[in-house]
Amino acid sequence: NANGYYDISMNNYFKKATYNQLSMVSYCYPLPEDDKVIAYEDIYPRNYYQPYNETTNPEGYTNQAEREFPLLKRAIEHIADFVPDTLNIDRDNDGYIDNVIFVVKGNVGDWSDLLWPHMWSMYGEDAYINGKKVGTFNFQLETSSYFTVSTLCHEMSHSLGFPDLYHYNYGTSLSPSGPWDLMCGNTNPPQHSSTYMEYKYGTWIDEIPEIGYGT
């Protein structure tokens, strides 16, 4: 939540990227005790949320959503009573919480596995906080040498409607915008998205002026 000029935080990133049009203040639940972060511990072990392998992980999943959404529902039910009803979690009044971020202890799994940073929307499992339904969420991992505040901003940008700009197919070197756009690569501190992306998906820019010869 830090918002000093040089602070590296998701709040400060969106403050600058939106030209002070968006405040991205986060609230942590369960509430910390002194300087200790308190976490929900699930009823299943970690390998239950890793891909199935007949030999190395027979308890693993074959359907990600069937494991992930019940997990997130239990986590929400665990913390729901901590969230004050005075906190506005649905600013557009559509009945859904604007966004929820789940931070999971430990390191990431393989690309696109359940234990990999992603944005998604819950379905098939209904979870509520103060009468508001959980829909769009970000899934983040606590520990990683690669994922930083940039990943927080990347996944939150998905929640705001921004698409990925990298190619999903392995074996290709195509990188449309490389390190020049948050939705294509990660840097620390996080780089901004392109002017077009901020105009098209963020609607933080009214128009893009055409710069021609002699302008």
Regions found by a protein language model. Give the residues of each.
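Active-site-proximal segments of metallohydrolase catalytic domains
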Residues: 3-130
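Extracellular hydrolytic enzyme modules, especially secreted metalloproteases
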Residues: 99, 105-215
